[in-house]
């Protein structure tokens, strides 16, 4: 199993490749992350109507196409999606690329019913020993572990399936809502980790606290925090003892 806990420094994780430096969830974003230097490349996995797994954060085509089209990503076939977003890779494309380079991979599974398929593909490409698969879905985590027990899995919290934290109209409400979720988190985390078999707690920085980090570590789990894009916030979460930090711009880690 891949190294998940903090050693002499926190693990550096490029969010959606390097979303600040290239179109997110593309091989170009992966390459930019590798150029800067990361320990893991994170990306999202979503299913299409034809069963193809692709790299996309949500079902909102407006978001995935960066404003070029509207509709539902999951209602499209691969050839239809590629007419709108030609550079969007399939999950197999991503695994093929990552198998050819030296970096860890973090697959954030957005499709609850495809955990078996995701784990089997990671195994087929020989990447189990440097992979983490995470999800908000307990079903997906169960299926991932059932298919490949050696695969490290992470429980994502809170769920942001529809990218609400990125929507401007909701932005003023997000910090308070997230803080409320974080208050009860320390006492709930040990039970959730045990129930899901998760090796990592993937936590939004807004719910993070010293108590949450300590409870996870006491339960034998690592703590990775998302999405950290400011130097002051980076210093704060590192001081709390997190094991991994996810950022849109991995150049932040060089400061």
Residue spans of the language-model regions?
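Phosphate-group recognition and catalysis centered on beta-loop-alpha active-site segments
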Residues: 1-255
């Amino acid at each position: 199993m891949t190294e998940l806990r903090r050693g002499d420094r926190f693990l550096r994780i490029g969010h959606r490749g390097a979303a600040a430096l290239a179109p997110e969830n593309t091989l170009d974003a992966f390459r930019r992350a590798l150029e800067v230097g990361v320990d893991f490349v994170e990306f999202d996995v979503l299913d299409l109507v034809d069963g193809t797994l692709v790299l996309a954060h949500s079902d909102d085509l407006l978001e995935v196409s960066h404003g070029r089209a509207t509709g539902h990503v999951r209602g499209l076939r691969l050839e239809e999606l590629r007419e709108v977003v030609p550079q969007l890779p399939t999950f197999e494309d991503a695994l093929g690329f990552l198998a050819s380079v030296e970096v860890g991979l973090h697959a954030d599974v957005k499709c609850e019913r495809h955990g078996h398929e995701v784990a089997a593909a990671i195994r087929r490409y020989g990447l189990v020993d440097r992979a983490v698969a995470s999800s908000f879905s307990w079903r997906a985590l169960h299926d991932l572990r059932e298919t490949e027990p050696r695969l490290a899995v992470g429980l994502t919290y809170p769920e942001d399936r529809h990218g609400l934290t990125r929507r401007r109209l909701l932005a003023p409400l997000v910090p308070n809502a997230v803080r409320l979720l974080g208050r009860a988190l320390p006492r709930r985390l040990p039970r959730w980790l045990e129930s899901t078999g998760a090796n990592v707690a993937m936590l939004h920085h807004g719910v993070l606290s010293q108590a949450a980090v300590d409870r996870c570590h006491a339960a034998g789990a690592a703590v990775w925090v998302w999405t950290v894009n400011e130097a002051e916030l980076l210093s704060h979460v590192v001081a709390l003892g997190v094991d991994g930090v996810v950022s849109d711009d991995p150049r932040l880690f060089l400061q």
